[in-house]
Amino acid sequence: MTTGEPSTRRTRRRVARVVLVASVVAALVAVAVVVAPLLLPPGPRPAFQLPVACGETWRLSTYPGHDDYDVDLFPTEGEAWGRPVLASYAGEVTVAGINGSLGARTPDNPKGPRGRGGGYWVKIDHGGKWETQYLHLLEPPLVRVGQRVARGEQIGRVGSTGNSGAPHLHYEQRRGWQKVETYFDGQPSGITEDDREYAVRLTSDNCAPR
């Protein structure tokens, strides 16, 4: 007389093996989906424009200890506080929030306590492993994570939140998540190493499509 128990145990073991194999395959596929894009080379450089209003001239500067390729932007005329900050190129917002702590520097209290890090900031993914970052914004960004933005769309206003000594826009371009020299209107900015204090002047061509 047979009870069927050995057969049942074998069936259960086979089912368990099938489930285990399926789980391993699913995990490998998930890893491949995540890792494969990371192995691709960066795409061509987008046609970045200055992240400020069309026709305005701004001073781009750096200083010792600032970090290579980081750019601080100051207007050459008028007040910096509250100036529109524009997307350098179309893309998707991946960060819109606070980096570090805000501090208390405002237009009404420009010498208030400094914060830490970048304060209010925005990061935009432009595809092809290219991204831009915009730091020390005056107030919460005007965009949200996941939002698609067009080149020239306003994403915030110039401020002095975070570790900032004066109102300005700290700006970066990254390729493959590594900082690179900023390009605007197809030309290198000239801001490279932070071995000394220096600046250049550029006029924005971040204008409405003609």
Where are these regions (language model features)?
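Sec-dependent N-terminal signal peptides
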Residues: R17-A27
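Terminal targeting segments of Actinobacterial cell-envelope proteins
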Residues: M1-V18
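C-terminal region of N-terminal signal peptides and the immediate post-cleavage residues
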Residues: A30-A47
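Short glycine/proline-centered loop/turn elements that form peptide/ligand docking sites
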Residues: L142-R144, Q154, S160-P167
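A structural signal for short beta-strand/turn segments enriched in small hydrophobics and glycine
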Residues: L60, G91-V93, G146-V158
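Short histidine-centered loop motifs in beta-beta connectors
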Residues: G78, L86, H126-G152, G176
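Zn2+-dependent peptidoglycan hydrolase active-site motif and core
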Residues: A87-E139, P167
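Acidic, glycine-rich catalytic/binding loops that coordinate metals and/or anionic ligands
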Residues: P44-Q49, E79, K111-R114, R144-E153, ...
